[in-house]
Regions:
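Conserved beta-loop-beta/alpha segment of the NTase-like Rossmann-fold superfamily
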Residues: 1-68, 113-118
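Short coil/turn connectors at secondary-structure junctions
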Residues: 9-12, 42-46, 58, 73-75, ...
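A generic local secondary-structure boundary/capping motif
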Residues: 36-38, 50-52, 64, 88-95, ...
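Glycine-rich, flexible loop/turn motifs
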Residues: 47, 56-59, 72-76, 87-88, ...
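Active-site donor-binding loop signature of nucleotide-sugar glycosyltransferases
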Residues: 51, 65, 81, 108, ...
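A short, charged helix-loop
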Residues: 65-98, 132-133
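Short glycine- and hydrophobic/aromatic-rich loop-to-beta-strand nucleating segment
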Residues: 102-106
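Left-handed beta-helix
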Residues: 108-263
Length: 263
């Protein structure tokens, strides 16, 4: 993608955004992006937006920064993949960690140079393609299965010395967890987030309830702060506080005899 854009504009700035995130404070977001574009235009920086954490969440990666007073952006010290709850609590208390939202801004020259330095073999492969013509897709389809499978964080950002972060309070949520879906969903008078046609609740509060099959009904009595998700192949019932354990549940289910058929 860098080569494709650079072929059209050798001085272009790029923003990389996940598709499944919710940003409520749009004005603040645009201001932070404008600052990032300005920095990327003037400096050889790789820039990321870091989200001000509101809780010790083990579902997100974390960015540690080196603070300098009266600055709107800071040099990145470390990236940490999804930590344990104990470590996440320590990160939150320290005050110098942000959530990694996967939002990046850079100039095509800066990111291409970083690819050349840290992922030279991959860069060489894609540099052989011709872009913005009929040959592009065939070339990429040939190369893509052969190159190293690695994230931009592991491949470049954890190694580069010119990575900067802009702290941002965006009203942000990664809709990849049930907790975040619940936080942003419409709720009834008992704070139940129900998105199914045929659900009756009694003495139940603070639950998120999802039924995939609209021809199925559910009656729930006495649950408080639970996740109830019924798919075509599996039923999940667990406390919302155990949201971060769902990946472990899925792994255990896969390890069942013929467990794959429930995925």
């Amino acid at each position: 993608m860098v080569n494709k854009i650079a072929d059209r504009d050798a001085d272009a700035n790029i923003i990389v955004l996940p598709a499944d995130h919710l940003i409520i404070k749009e004005k603040t977001f645009l201001e932070k992006v404008e600052l990032a574009f300005d920095l990327a235009s003037k400096h050889d920086y790789l820039i990321t937006l870091g989200i001000t954490p509101t809780r010790p969440d083990t579902g997100y990666g974390y960015i540690q920064f080196i603070e300098k007073k009266e600055e709107e952006f800071f040099k990145v010290k470390t990236f940490t993949e999804k930590p344990s709850l104990e470590i996440a609590k320590a990160f939150l208390e320290s005050g110098d960690f942000l959530w990694n939202a996967g939002i990046f801004v850079w100039n095509v020259k800066s990111i291409h140079k970083a690819f050349q330095e840290f992922l030279p073999e991959m860069t060489h492969e894609f540099d052989t393609c011709e872009y913005n013509n009929d040959k592009e897709s065939v070339c990429i389809e040939t190369i893509y299965p052969k190159v190293e499978k690695i994230s931009i964080d592991n491949g470049i950002l954890e190694k580069a010395k010119n990575v900067y972060v802009i702290p941002a309070d965006l009203g942000w949520s990664d809709l990849g967890t049930w907790t975040s879906v619940y936080e942003n969903a419409e709720k009834d008078e008992n704070n139940n987030a129900v998105k199914s046609k045929h659900v009756l609740t009694y003495n139940s509060k603070g639950n998120i309830i999802r039924l995939r099959n609209n021809n199925k009904a559910a009656i729930i009595d006495g649950l408080e702060n639970y996740i109830v998700v019924d798919t075509e192949k599996a039923l999940l019932i667990c406390p919302i506080s155990n949201d971060q354990l769902i990946k472990d549940y899925v792994l255990d289910l896969k390890n069942f005899k013929k467990g794959e058929k429930f995925m």
